[in-house]
Amino acid sequence: MIIGIPKEVKVREYRVGVVPAGVVKLVESGHQVLVQQGAGIGSGLNDQSYHQAGAQIVANAEEIYGRSKLIVKVKEPDESEIELIQENQIIYAYLHLAANPRLTQQLLESKCIAVAYETIQQPDGSLPLLLSLIHI
């Protein structure tokens, strides 16, 4: 599967969907990983570290969304990203859909498969992705 890691566009969002160590594991599992140029800069991760981990660095979000089956983000897509989402593309991010009916409708209309981190539940009922990302 081709997995895309776009640069976050939300103001003051410096995290990135996957760190280089995660890219290594994905590549070792047979996936191709595309990382948007500069995606990790806000987290202190440069493009070279992603390249060394096995990712291909691409210039822009259009290429990430255009080539990837799975998009891994931190925050919900904004208006500029919504128009890039393709039918049956998997979007994995904190979506906060209860607070944003417009985004919910836009994702439904795009016919993507949207997975909200905050709704992933363990068998014991815990919500592990509501912990700090440092623990995940």
List the predicted regions and their residue ranges.
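An N-terminal-biased, well-structured beta-alpha scaffold segment characteristic
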Residues: 2-110
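Acidic-glycine-rich active-site phosphate/pyrophosphate-binding loop
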Residues: 108-123
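Glycine-/Pro-rich loop/turn segments that contact NAD(P) or position catalytic residues
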Residues: 120-132
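Conserved small/polar residues in nucleotide/adenosyl-binding loops
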Residues: 134-136
